């Protein structure tokens, strides 16, 4: 997966770049907050969710959510660091089963906790189902735990319960775990530390060797080397040492025409960005001019973005008029129970809701535009050939809105894994960040629930027409198994 490879390189580059800058401390030394204040934050969070979240009881009934809230309160028995408290909040929010409802450090907290970044778990792992495979190792000379090695346990804890434990503090749409597995893959080291802390100086790694035998190896936690005391020699070294080039950041959107394969390859990693509509328009003009009969749209790295952009891409491919959703509803007209300190964080959203929402007979406040308006196909440079949509666990939010009107179209084939974004619907519209007053944690609060098609079963993601799971062999060999599958399909058809 190109996304996974780039993010692994970027992660380790950041690790090495930040390592020598500041002295590192263990999480156990982080400042603590009194339990009474943390409980107040939980109560504030609970009130805001009950009053404003449109999908708080969509997958989890009220009595269960109340039980999880009581459990969260009970877990705050003593003073806690913000790092530890974040897990309490994350675990509670995860029970809502909404991928757009999550908790994060504020910029101020991120800066404060930079000094607790190390030690770190040294491996990056690709995780799916009950499998984990090495895709990166900070110790590049390690000849044992190298790319493609299957990991079966860490510190004697088997991969499945270990991963399930981390999933407990991650949010996703419904019951699908594919989004969680891809987010975990993108930054395994940080998620491992978030869940299990940094008390270990050495990790026991159980793995399968090249002969298929179960083995165990030790690997040290990564601790950055301390800067040399001789500042003069450090300065001299800094001047004489050539600067390493930063890894090139890949473009958000790319188009490649392979005339020999009669195929256009379009990679869209986000539906955000002011230049996307222009890219889409120019791409389909180029595709039309080239005359290719196959189009591959790669959404495996696409976590969502602007609905107008995803809709525009659908219009160039859909053979029929479509609407975005059967229903788009909010619980109220404004935003209630939010601390006054968040006024500037929410005022825009509250005003926008009051303008676009209309109360209906069901007592909910509806955004009628997306419920009633049908978007017609764009005729000029419309693509009528065979379309292959590549998707995976990180295909989320607006990406599933792009796919939604295309799913039953005869010339469309979805290839890959179940999407991370919901098949039935999501809560992806208008998401302010609310700051909890005592911990200073930020949580994302969706304001609208969007149901794409009320006749669909809820709880899972968009299922592919052709399932292609990850493979330890493909990871070891470094080839893109999903893209190669599509290329073979096109070759066989041609």
Give the residues covered by each predicted segment.
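Short, well-ordered alpha-helical microsegments
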Residues: 20, 276, 398-399
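Bacterial Sec-dependent N-terminal signal peptides
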Residues: 1-28, 45
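Flexible, low-complexity junctional segments that flank or bridge functional domains
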Residues: 24-295, 299-329, 423, 428-436, ...
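Conserved acidic, small-residue-rich alpha-beta core segments centered on
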Residues: 149, 307-475
């Amino acid at each position: 997966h190109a996304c996974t490879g780039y993010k692994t390189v970027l992660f380790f580059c950041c690790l090495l770049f930040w390592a020598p800058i500041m002295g590192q401390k263990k999480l156990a030394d982080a400042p603590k907050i009194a339990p009474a204040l943390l409980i107040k934050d939980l109560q504030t969070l609970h009130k805001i969710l009950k009053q404003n979240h449109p999908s708080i009881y969509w997958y989890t009934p009220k009595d269960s959510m109340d039980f999880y809230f009581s459990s969260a309160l009970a877990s705050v028995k003593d003073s806690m660091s913000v790092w530890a408290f974040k897990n309490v909040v994350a675990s509670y929010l995860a029970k809502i089963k909404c991928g757009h409802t999550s908790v994060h450090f504020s910029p101020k907290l991120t800066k404060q906790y930079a000094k607790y970044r190390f030690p770190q778990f040294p491996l990056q792992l690709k995780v799916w189902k009950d499998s984990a495979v090495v895709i990166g190792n900070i110790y590049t000379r390690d000849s044992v735990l190298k790319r493609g090695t299957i990991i079966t346990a860490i510190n004697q804890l088997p991969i499945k319960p270990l991963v399930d434990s981390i999933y407990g503090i991650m949010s996703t749409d419904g019951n699908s775990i594919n989004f969680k597995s891809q987010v975990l893959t993108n930054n395994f080291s940080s998620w491992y530390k978030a869940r299990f802390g940094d008390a270990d100086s050495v990790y026991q790694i159980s793995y399968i060797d090249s002969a298929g035998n179960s083995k165990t190896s030790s690997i040290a936690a990564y601790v950055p080397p301390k800067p040399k005391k001789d500042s003069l020699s450090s300065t001299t070294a800094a001047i004489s040492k050539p600067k390493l080039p930063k890894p090139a950041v890949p473009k958000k959107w790319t188009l490649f025409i392979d005339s020999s394969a009669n195929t256009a390859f379009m990679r869209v990693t986000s539906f955000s960005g002011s230049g996307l509509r222009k890219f889409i328009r120019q791409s389909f003009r180029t595709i039309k001019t080239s005359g290719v009969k196959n189009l591959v749209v790669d959404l495996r790295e696409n976590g969502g973005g602007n609905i107008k952009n995803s809709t525009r891409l659908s219009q160039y491919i859909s053979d029929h008029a479509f609407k975005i959703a059967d229903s788009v509803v909010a619980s109220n007209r404004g935003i209630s129970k939010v601390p006054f300190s968040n006024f500037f964080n929410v005022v825009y959203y509250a005003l926008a809701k009051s303008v676009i929402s209309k109360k209906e007979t069901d007592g909910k406040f509806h955004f009628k535009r997306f419920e009633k308006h049908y978007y017609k196909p764009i005729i000029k440079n419309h693509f009528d050939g065979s379309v292959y949509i590549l998707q995976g666990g990180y295909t989320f939010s607006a990406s599933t809105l792009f796919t939604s009107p295309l799913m039953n179209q005869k010339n469309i084939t979805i290839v890959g894994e179940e999407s991370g974004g919901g098949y039935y619907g999501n809560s992806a519209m208008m998401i302010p960040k609310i700051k909890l007053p005592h911990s200073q944690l930020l949580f994302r609060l969706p304001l609208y629930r969007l149901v794409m098609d009320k006749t669909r079963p809820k709880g899972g993601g968009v299922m592919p027409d052709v399932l292609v799971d990850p493979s330890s062999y493909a990871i070891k060999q470094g080839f893109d198994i999903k893209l190669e599958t599509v290329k073979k399909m096109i070759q066989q058809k041609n």
